[in-house]
Amino acid sequence: MAKEIKTIGVLTSGGDAPGMNAAIRAVVRTAIARGLKVKGIKKGYQGLLNEEIIDMEAKDVSDIIQRGGTILGTARCLEFKEAEGQKKGAEICKKHGIDGIVVIGGDGSYRGAQALSRLGINTIGLPGTIDLDIACTEYTIGFDTAVNTAMQAIDKVKDTSSSHERCSIIEVMGRNAGYIALRCGIANGAEDILLPEKYDYNEQNIINNIITNRKHGKTHHIIINAEGIGHSTSMARRIEAATGIETRATILGYMQRGGSPTAKDRYYASIMGAYAVDIMLEGKTNRVVGYQHGEFIDFDIEEALQMEKGINEYQFEVSHLLSI
């Protein structure tokens, strides 16, 4: 018999992502519309352990859909990685009458949700990460905004790079996943794209490419470098020394996490938030919401965590075809 759900909690965990507020809003309003009470848990799992728990009404999420970041705050919590911390979190949920929690975050957040589910708290995970590195879904909350934010900056760097006939290395986020770099590189027309999934790149090939392109009349060269490759500043020095072409590195950093979410991030986050509440009311737990082939779906958390997501080889090939 499915556990009766009367009160749900919602938290954001790990790195913030534009669109998290849209998801929070959807969870709160859908739950209230379905006759549930809602508790907001501040600062992720750390806030749960600290009992930073507030009642939430529909008015509390007014005018947040367009805001970046997360109104609940977020934090990383080492204590919650341990069994004692997880047990404490489940006990606090029961103390506050929380029957289920919607967790918005990445893989690490899912593991925390999985632990709570094993301890009797219904949990549903939503993919909140700008990196698009969750294998069970083609979309993650914040990715589209991060790409658009990075693109605006890259376009500006490209303008000045062209004016000064420079080589420019622009480093974007993606410690273990190169999806932002690949998407931006293709959309910007970059000459080279460096991805963590292709870590065996040859720097001499890049240098040769720059020299060849200059001989063919290209007056500037754009390299999009994922954070997982890194070392953009030292790479710029080596390229300039080898080619004699002025080379500059620009590291975009945390600006990619901020800003008002795009229409796509607002829309998808809203649908996912509502979907999470509804599948919880169906009695589902230990699930994560994803988007595949035009549909919103859900997976067992363990199944989702075991999936592997590689870079799209055809898209990577196209990036080379278009860079000549």
Give the positions of each predicted feature.
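Glycine-rich oxoanion-binding loops at beta->alpha junctions
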Residues: A2, L48-I101, G108, I141-N148, ...
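N-terminal phosphate-binding or glycine-rich loops at protein starts, especially the Walker A/P-loop
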Residues: A2-L49
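Short glycine/serine/threonine-rich phosphate/pyrophosphate-binding segments
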Residues: A17-V27, L49, A83-E84, G100-Q114, ...
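Short, acidic/small-residue loops that bind anionic groups at enzyme active sites
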Residues: K39, S117-T140, L194-K198, I251
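Accessory alpha-helical/coil subdomains and C-terminal extensions
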Residues: V103-G105, A115, N122, F143-E246, ...
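Short beta-strand elements at the ligand-binding edges of bilobed clamshell
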Residues: C136-V147, S260-R266
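Phosphate-binding loop/pocket of nucleotide- and phosphate-handling active sites
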Residues: R287-I324
